[in-house]
Amino acid sequence: MASSSGSKAEFIVGGKYKLVRKIGSGSFGDIYLAINITNGEEVAVKLESQKARHPQLLYESKLYKILQGGVGIPHIRWYGQEKDYNVLVMDLLGPSLEDLFNFCSRRFTMKTVLMLADQMISRIEYVHTKNFIHRDIKPDNFLMGIGRHCNKLFLIDFGLAKKYRDNRTRQHIPYREDKNLTGTARYASINAHLGIEQSRRDDMESLGYVLMYFNRTSLPWQGLKAATKKQKYEKISEKKMSTPVEVLCKGFPAEFAMYLNYCRGLRFEEAPDYMYLRQLFRILFRTLNHQYDYTFDWTMLKQKAAQQAASSSGQGQQAQTPTGKQTDKSKSNMKGF
């Protein structure tokens, strides 16, 4: 966005949402913290220039409307045009899983990974029940809620989502093999790399890579160098295809390899058995004698930070509050989390 944040000091959208400060950015534009001047409530505002080459905010707002009411789907307050922007006003959420992973020194315990997996499978399943696939499953697009929703995981960013079947007839989109890669190469399914039309199986496979990213700290195809983006994607694809699932998941419970092998074995139109996948991880969770108490790795760190802050000055409190990295497209905000 060309204009400075200073010029938005008195920018009010939708008649009552006053922009406070920028809290994130992405390929589409910027995300701002805003306040509802009628009741003081904090919200998130997504701004997209009306001159954007590939506008997606209107499409995304329509998708959020279709998904409204689902657990872990942010509530949309307003969509419209203001000055030279398309504007989407929605719930303010907490940090992304990428932010939290960094905050936890890029280490998650098995307990945290399994509690997240349970919610992540359910969020993707809900989107699929509404006849859409997400097509950009990655840690940056899962955000924790704030306040009373601080243990609830939210799925965001539906700009790349696609309808995979007709609402009425349930007719599935046709199989094709001439597609460009949509989404993030690091977490893309093998079929997406091969140019095959994405379907439900691809969202689920991507989630498998996200879980292994959390387990391992990084994936074998990260950090590959190439002259062009196209060549880099090819290298990632080659490495992904040449890394057996058993090698990727070596040293971790067999359930992760079972999950990925199951997803890779799904047919194009086949509905994933979400309950089976949740149960895989739930049974493992119980076997490891964990308690489903919503105590995530960052819960402990936050408590320590709060205790340290309480024993130091007000300024110290500011310093101790984790801010996380403002990742691309992330509505990250640790305040009130």
UniProtKB/Swiss-Prot annotation:
Main function:
Casein kinases are operationally defined by their preferential utilization of acidic proteins such as caseins as substrates. It can phosphorylate a large number of proteins. Participates in Wnt signaling. May play a role in segregating chromosomes during mitosis. May play a role in keratin cytoskeleton disassembly. Phosphorylates protein custos.
Q: Which segments constitute the Protein kinase domain?
A: 17-285
Quote the InterPro entries the UniProt record gives.
CK1_Ser-Thr_kinase, Kinase-like_dom_sf, Prot_kinase_dom, Protein_kinase_ATP_BS, Ser/Thr_kinase_AS
Q: What is this protein called?
A: Casein kinase I isoform alpha
Q: Which residues does ATP bind?
A: 23-31, 46
What's a single GO BP term from this record? Answer: intermediate filament cytoskeleton organization
- Keywords noted in UniProt: ATP-binding, Cell cycle, Cell division, Cell projection, Centromere, Chromosome, Cytoplasm, Cytoskeleton, Kinase, Kinetochore, Mitosis, Nucleotide-binding, Nucleus, Phosphoprotein, Serine/threonine-protein kinase, Transferase, Wnt signaling pathway
Task: State the Gene Ontology terms under molecular function.
Answer: ATP binding; protein serine kinase activity; protein serine/threonine kinase activity
* Post-translational modification as stated in the protein's UniProt record: Autophosphorylated.
